[in-house]
Amino acid sequence: MKKILIIGSGAMGAAFSIPLIENNHKVTLSEPYNLKLLKKLSLKKKFHPALKINLPKKLVIQKFSSDILSFKWDLIVIA
């Protein structure tokens, strides 16, 4: 299991997170700009409006800050 950070919670970042979680990786989706989208994704069902699907429950959603980069990630993706 790898720890993966995806920076950008738009359609591309969110869609990329799904197969990673299905393959038992720990994925954190972080959004630096669109706080309105971040708030929607943080709700219980994690519905993504562009993809029109509920994101996996195991997906961690977090507001981006420079502190997040100090964690030990196996992979960082900018989407």
Give the role of each language-model region.
Residues M1-N54, L59-S66, S70:
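NAD(P)+-binding Rossmann beta1-loop-alpha1 motif at the extreme N-terminus of oxidoreductases
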Residues L75-I78:
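N-terminal Rossmann-like NAD(P) cofactor-binding module of classical short-chain dehydrogenase/reductase
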